[in-house]
C-alpha cells in the first residue's frame, strides 16, 4: 500500500530511514532444524516447503519495510514542519503581548471615558450642601463664603479652595469640605471659642485661645478681661498670658476676672472677688497651677506662685 499527495522531501527521508531499518532484518528464514541442501537433491515436497518459507519471509520483509517507512515518514514530517516553522513559539509570545497591550489600551480608554462622564454629568452634581458645626455662624454666611454654584458636578469642585474660603469667616477656626456621592457637598466647620475679652473704642473684642480677635460683641458672662497692650496671635505677651490661662484648673479659671501681662515676665491674675495672683513667667506653668489650686483654699489677699518651690499667701 502506498500514500499519495505527500511532500517529496518527506518521501525521500522516509525511504532512506526505511532502507536503513530494513537492512537490519534477517533475510534467511530457513528452519534451523532442517539443514540446507543443494536444490538438485531436493524432492518436490521439500522444494514446495522451501518456496512457501521464502514467500513468507519476503512478505514479512515487505511488511517490515512498509511499517518502517511509515514510521520514518511520520518522524520526518514532524521534523520538517518544525524546521519550516522555527519561530512559532516566539510568534505566540508576540500575539500574547499584543493582546495584553490591546486590553490595557481598552481599559485605559474606558477609564478615561468614565472619568470624563463623571466629571461632566449632572447626575453627580452638588444638588445639596450639608453644613455641620454652625452656631454663631449662620448657614448663609457659610454658603456666601463657599461660593459653590448649585448643580455643579462634584468632581469639578475644588474642596480645598472651598474650605479655604469658608475659613476666612472670622468666627471659623477651621473648615473641611467633602464630596458625598451621588449629589451632596458636606462642609464641616469649627467655630472659635472666646476665652478673653478686651475693650476697644468700638466695643469689646473677643479673643480665642490662639489670640485671634474674631468678633466685636458683648462678652459671655464671667469671661475674663484681657490687659495687654497689643493683643494678637503673634504678640509674645498675648501668647504668655493665654498660656497661663489655659494651664489653670477649671475651678480656678472660672474665678479669674482679669489677666494682665505688661511683659512676659510679670503676669498677674485678678480673681472676681478681688484677690490677686502673682504668677511671674510662663516657666513651670503646670506646677504653678497645682500650687495655686491648693493655696486658694487658704484665706488671704495676695497669692504668689512666681516661685513654685516657695509659694506664699499674704
UniProtKB/Swiss-Prot annotation:
Sites bearing N-acetylthreonine, chain numbering: 2
Domain POTRA, first and last residues per copy: 124-192
Membrane topology: Single-pass type II membrane protein
Region (Disordered): 1-57
Bias-annotated ranges (Basic and acidic residues): 1-15, 30-57
Protein's UniProt keywords contain Transferase: no
Extracellular side: 121-314
Topological domains annotated Cytoplasmic: 2-99
Main location: membrane
Domain of life: Bacteria
Compartment(s) where it occurs, according to its Swiss-Prot or TrEMBL record: Cell membrane
Membrane-crossing residue ranges in chain numbering: 100-120
Keyword list, A-Z: Acetylation, Cell cycle, Cell division, Cell membrane, Membrane, Transmembrane, Transmembrane helix
UniProt keyword annotation of Cell membrane present: yes
One Pfam family this sequence matches: POTRA_1
Gene3D superfamilies listed in its UniProt record: membrane protein fhac (3.10.20.310)
GO terms classed as biological process: cell septum assembly; FtsZ-dependent cytokinesis
Gene Ontology cellular component list: cell division site; cytosol; plasma membrane
Family under the similarity heading: Belongs to the FtsQ/DivIB family. FtsQ subfamily.
General function of this protein: Essential cell division protein.
Protein name: Cell division protein FtsQ
Organism phylogeny: Bacteria, Bacillati, Actinomycetota, Actinomycetes, Mycobacteriales
Amino acid at each position: 500500500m502506498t500514500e499519495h499527495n505527500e511532500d517529496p522531501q518527506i518521501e525521500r527521508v522516509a525511504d532512506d530511514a526505511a532502507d536503513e531499518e530494513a537492512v537490519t532484518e534477517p533475510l534467511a528464514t530457513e528452519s534451523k532444524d532442517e539443514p540446507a541442501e543443494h536444490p538438485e537433491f531436493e524432492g518436490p515436497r521439500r522444494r514446495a516447503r522451501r518456496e512457501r518459507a521464502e514467500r513468507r519471509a519476503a512478505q514479512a520483509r515487505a511488511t517490515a519495510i512498509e511499517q518502517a517507512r511509515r514510521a520514518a515518514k511520520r518522524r520526518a514530517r514532524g521534523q520538517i514542519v518544525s524546521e519550516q516553522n522555527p519561530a512559532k513559539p516566539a510568534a505566540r509570545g508576540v500575539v500574547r503581548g499584543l493582546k495584553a497591550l490591546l486590553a490595557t489600551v481598552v481599559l485605559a480608554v474606558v477609564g478615561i471615558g468614565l472619568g470624563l462622564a463623571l466629571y461632566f454629568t449632572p447626575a453627580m452634581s452638588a444638588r445639596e450642601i450639608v453644613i455641620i458645626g454652625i452656631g454663631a455662624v449662620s448657614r448663609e454666611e457659610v454658603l456666601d463664603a463657599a461660593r459653590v454654584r448649585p448643580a455643579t458636578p462634584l468632581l469639578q469642585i475644588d474642596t480645598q479652595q472651598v474650605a479655604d474660603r469658608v475659613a476666612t469667616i472670622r468666627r471659623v477656626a477651621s473648615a473641611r469640605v467633602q464630596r458625598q456621592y451621588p449629589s451632596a457637598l458636606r462642609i464641616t466647620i469649627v467655630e472659635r471659642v472666646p476665652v478673653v475679652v478686651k475693650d476697644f473704642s468700638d466695643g469689646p473684642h473677643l479673643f480665642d485661645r490662639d489670640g485671634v480677635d474674631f468678633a466685636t460683641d458683648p462678652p459671655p458672662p464671667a469671661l475674663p478681661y484681657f490687659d495687654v497692650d497689643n493683643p494678637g496671635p503673634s504678640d509674645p505677651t498675648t501668647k504668655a498670658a493665654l498660656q497661663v490661662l489655659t494651664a489653670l484648673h477649671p475651678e480656678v479659671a472660672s474665678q479669674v476676672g482679669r489677666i494682665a501681662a505688661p511683659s512676659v515676665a510679670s503676669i498677674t491674675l485678678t480673681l472676681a472677688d478681688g484677690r490677686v495672683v502673682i504668677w511671674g513667667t510662663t516657666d513651670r506653668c503646670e506646677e504653678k497651677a497645682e500650687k495655686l489650686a491648693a493655696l486658694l483654699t487658704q484665706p488671704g489677699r495676695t497669692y504668689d506662685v512666681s516661685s513654685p518651690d516657695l509659694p506664699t499667701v499674704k
